[in-house]
Amino acid sequence: REGIERANRIVMNDLPDGIRTIRITENRLNLPQVTTETEVSSLKRHLEGEPLGHETQLAQKRVEPMVPKTTEQGWYIDKSRFDFHIDPVLNQSVGGPENFYMYQLGVMGTADWWVTDHLLTTGSLFANLANNYDKFNYTNPPQDSHLPRVRTHVRDYVQNDVYVNNLQANYFQSLGNGFYGQVYGGYLETMYGGAGAEVLYRPLDSNWAFGVDANYVKQRDWRSAQDMMKFTDYSVKTGHLTAYWNPSFAQDVLVKASVGQYLAGDKGGTLEIAKRFDSGVVVGGYATITNASPDEYGEGDFTKGVYVSVPLDLFSSGPTRSRAAIGWTPLTRDGGQQLGRKFGLYDMTSDRSVNFR
């Protein structure tokens, strides 16, 4: 909202006579989120200052995103279609039976290229600096388990010094009336490649939303960095129906519940609860229970974890939406594992939240 205030001030400095309303439409990854309408006369009074005791409320409202008509005058922010950045990466797991603290430290180089306003191609190359996953000795599932090893080959993947983490194409589209969609395909994460789609319904300034995603993926080979561009024989259909809820009595809390099929073919649900603080820091936890029995799952019985997400603008001199996430997963096992998609529509449409600030 500070961005809206700054934009309004800039527009007012060069505003032609006779303009009654300023409309500012926010976009994220070229998806229109929301249009903020501000009455010029009201804004002018606020900028000039009002007499003490005679202050009025700024005449401003949020509406569904609008595209300027041909008869309207407008401006837009011109951004480069190509972007490249390098980021530090720390993956970690706490409390495992093999070693209490396991980590992987590296750097990730990412290149993004917008082919069109809706089609994004993106790829990331990971360089491994240090890790202690040689102590991850989980090589055989429980004898009575029928779960395929969808995550416990992690040691084999991270022993490669440099590898393509993801290389994919995403097509994003605003479908109107609060609906958003995306389709994607390629190497979607370290361990899986394939194709999928997601649709989200998120009414403006609502405290709830619903989404569904469906994917067909194959497991990437782990024997070498070159082999990671190939696939094993294992493939699976995975997807979830997800509900998002910000309780009216605790609007800084997000409750996320999903049901569907996981990477090992097991079916069940995940409950995630996260708390956002005034600083922007988010602390959350999750648990997943599926039809895989505790004996099939192995030590730990079910998948669970906690995480902390920190906005990087706390440490930056300029505004940024980037965040750093630190997660703790007590055990890495094969049951209840979701596909690690790079883009999720709910996070991409945060400007539509009733709590957006």
Model-predicted regions and their roles:
Residues 117-122, 176-181, 206-211, 248-256, ...:
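Repeated loop/turn-to-beta-strand initiation elements of outer-membrane beta-barrel proteins
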Residues 179-182, 190-193:
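Phosphate-interacting basic helix/loop segments used at nucleotide- and nucleic-acid interfaces
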Residues 86-92, 123-127, 183-187, 197, ...:
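Transmembrane beta-barrel strands of outer-membrane/channel proteins
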